[in-house]
Amino acid sequence: MDFTYLDNLSGAYAESRILHAAVELNIFDTIGDKGMSTEDAAAKLHTDERATGLILNALTAMNLLKKEDNLFYLNDLSKKYLLSTSEACYAGMIRFESSMWNVWEGLSKAIRTGKPARIPDMYQTNRDDTECFIMAMHHLVSARGDATYLAEKLNMEGVNSLLDIGSGPGTYPVAIYKRHPGISISIFDLPGTLDITRKVLEKEGIRPRIKLISGDYNKDSLPQGFDVIFLSNIIHGEDEDANSNLMQKIYSSLNPGGRVIIKDHIMDESLTKPTCGAIFSIYMLLTTKGRDYGYHEVQKWLEDAGFIDITREDLPQPMSSTIVCGKKV
């Protein structure tokens, strides 16, 4: 590492903001499958022609567009991930990250005080915020392929019932149902979130097949009698005591021999690796009471709750998570 590394690190936000603005302005959908000049793009976008040319050139330099004979085209990457019509569209996640820009301005204060820069309400206070957050999670998992991969990989032999806690858009239950239609699947989540979940399930055409249960896992009892309880990206949003209590609740809700499956960033004992997890912990500092936890911490919560046969498995890239499983006696 040298000066260039530090220089790039300090200025990395510039590329992020260019991408955020391009998605906000709908540049990729506007260009679509045809080449477009700066003049035509500015006319369709209702933007300044000079400024439009500058951002189109920047997006080309960032390998998000191609430029030939003064016309701009989408490339394979932007066609797959930045067109709203693509099944792998990632734009929802980019919009959400853009909406967090002002939150990051509060980082120094958050470190001084130890308090989040944003009220940790899981984006439930404002309906638009709820939809932005939940659909961002849907776009992330769909674009990266997590749900499809796990639905194929997880051993569901002998499983008759599954509960997804904090499912958000329901992306994982949808994939599991399509792979294992004989399993009775339930989702337990906050009422504001379930309004968005219903839309996703209706779009997938399987709304009646998945049961939606409204509740707060920190305050309410969990429904009972499941062979598998799944929770993805939940523990990083909670503090140690809340996670320990949640494992106790999950143990009580499982059938004998049932399994808990946790998918999350799982850190090494130094809490510095993987890099994405250490950085994501700062995100959690800004917006929740949580952080990313080490395997030794998760293992202890599970053991204290009574789980046995605890295992972990790192998922392949581009997924950045680990699966931790435990079995009820």
Each model region followed by its residue ranges:
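Conserved Class I S-adenosyl-L-methionine-dependent methyltransferase catalytic core
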Residues: 3-24, 29-30, 35, 44, ...
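Alpha-helical subdomain
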Residues: 1-67, 156, 161, 165-329
